[in-house]
Amino acid sequence: MNRASLEKRPDEVATMFDDVAPKYDVVNDVLSMGQTRRWRRIVVDAMDVKVGQKVLDLAAGTGTSSEPYADAGVDVVACDFSLGMLKVGKRRRPDIDFIAGDATNLPFADNSFDASTISFGLRNVVEPRKALEEMLRVTKPGGRLVIAEFSHPVVPLWRNLYTEYLMRALPAIATKVSSNPDAYVYLAESIRAWPDQDHLAQWLSDAGWTDITYRNLSGGIVAVHRAQKPDEHRESVPVAKLRRQIKPRHQAG
């Protein structure tokens, strides 16, 4: 069995995802009790991209998150550093452009995409702040970024129940449905170690993104952050003004 440590060495993380690739989407549906696909639909709505626009879907894995864009006539590039995931995705959707790439050193020119997105992948990057800077670099001025990531439930009782599920129930279920249950121990540990909604918003501001908002889904189990790359003639909003800039939405979603 292969699992990554919380040091998130790229070779370990890539190997772990290679191992789980064949059943990745099915296991996700089971472990999220069917919520994963709903969360991804909300991300697509938040992206609000048009036919003919070009979108970067980073940490796209098998391309499940890329499919809605391709089906809608959007030029989507599915990028991931797990070759195993990309192979599964290319077999499923040969019409989608799958490209191997490192989130901290993207293989794209500046200002290549009208919008960028990453769902449930930023947490697995060894230098997530560098990834935010790289996505800023490859996104066109005025372009949008949408991030979906596991976060921190906002209701204390719900937070306690969720922690119990992560650390006890999830690994037990993974043993039954996954070929590499140890990978889902890493999943639980990495979620617990991930910063909360406001900290991620601060990282976005530090990276140069503006107009930052977030929305909590399922009581804060997942947060969807949205931001914009400044137009070339605009200056980034000072970090001191971030609290006034962020407009959190705490509904369960």
From Swiss-Prot:
Q: What InterPro entries is this protein classified in?
A: SAM-dependent_MTases_sf (IPR029063), UbiE/COQ5_MeTrFase (IPR004033), UbiE/COQ5_MeTrFase_CS (IPR023576)
UniProt GO molecular function? demethylmenaquinone methyltransferase activity
Write down the top EC class of this protein: transferase
Pathway, per UniProt? Quinol/quinone metabolism; menaquinone biosynthesis; menaquinol from 1,4-dihydroxy-2-naphthoate: step 2/2
- Reaction(s) catalysed (UniProt annotation): a 2-demethylmenaquinol + S-adenosyl-L-methionine = a menaquinol + S-adenosyl-L-homocysteine + H(+)
Q: Name the Enzyme Commission number(s) assigned to this protein.
A: 2.1.1.163
Q: Which residues form the signal peptide?
A: none
Binding residue positions for S-adenosyl-L-methionine: T62, D80, D102, A103, S119
Looking up Pfam families in the UniProt record yields: Ubie_methyltran
UniProt keyword terms in alphabetical order: Menaquinone biosynthesis, Methyltransferase, S-adenosyl-L-methionine, Transferase
Name its GO BP terms in alphabetical order: menaquinone biosynthetic process; methylation
What functional role does this protein have?
A: Methyltransferase required for the conversion of demethylmenaquinol (DMKH2) to menaquinol (MKH2).
Entry's family note:
Belongs to the class I-like SAM-binding methyltransferase superfamily. MenG/UbiE family.
What name goes with this protein? Demethylmenaquinone methyltransferase
Give the species this sequence originates from: Paenarthrobacter aurescens (strain TC1)
